[in-house]
Amino acid sequence: MISIGTDLVHIPAFADQLAQPGSSFMDVFGAGERRLASRRAGNRNAEHLAGRWAAKEAFIKAWSQAIYGQPPVIPEEDVQWALIEVRADRWGRVALDIAPSLDTQVRESIGDYTTSLSISHDGDYATAVCVLSYAVATENR
């Protein structure tokens, strides 16, 4: 393991932020994330996206922790969040897709890596944990 990151999102506050007139907050989500969220009615949309937002934050925190003692490769205000996309398989298990431009920056700073992701919801909260590990070649993959 290289490092771990976690994030917790208050869903009602997140929903309020999404609903603000003129808000461009949806731009932090990739097309696939927005498409999946649009299939959920009402607050389920915000709940779904809150988990995805927590996952993106958890990834950035894990990456930042991996280079502890060094300046961030990308200042937080310059992160292009849509380059970090959460996808799910048909059973709902989640993984991260990191766009090639960002993936290159991550690999240049920490080496060859893989991610493990978990998202959970309980009541008014969504949480995510992201673990960065060194990539290891396996025969069974």
Swiss-Prot record:
**Record HAMAP family:** AcpS (MF_00101)
- Would the keyword Lipid biosynthesis turn up in this protein's UniProt record? yes
Among the GO molecular function terms of this UniProt record, one is: holo-[acyl-carrier-protein] synthase activity
Q: Which GO terms describe its biological process?
A: fatty acid biosynthetic process
Give me the reactions it catalyses: apo-[ACP] + CoA = holo-[ACP] + adenosine 3',5'-bisphosphate + H(+)
Q: Which domain of life, per UniProt? A: Bacteria
Is Lipid metabolism included in the keywords of this UniProt record?
A: yes
Q: Which GO terms describe its cellular component?
A: cytoplasm
Major location category of this protein: cytoplasm
The UniProt family comment states:
Belongs to the P-Pant transferase superfamily. AcpS family.
Subcellular location, record wording: Cytoplasm
Cofactor names from the entry are: Mg(2+)
Which EC class does it fall in?
A: transferase
- Please provide the record's keywords in A-Z order: Cytoplasm, Fatty acid biosynthesis, Fatty acid metabolism, Lipid biosynthesis, Lipid metabolism, Magnesium, Metal-binding, Transferase
In short, the EC number is: 2.7.8.7
InterPro entries, per this entry? 4-PPantetheinyl_Trfase_dom, 4-PPantetheinyl_Trfase_dom_sf, ACPS, Ppantetheine-prot_Trfase_dom
Residues noted as binding Mg(2+) in the record, renumbered to the chain: 7, 57
Described purpose of this protein according to its UniProt entry: Transfers the 4'-phosphopantetheine moiety from coenzyme A to a Ser of acyl-carrier-protein.
The protein's name is: Holo-[acyl-carrier-protein] synthase
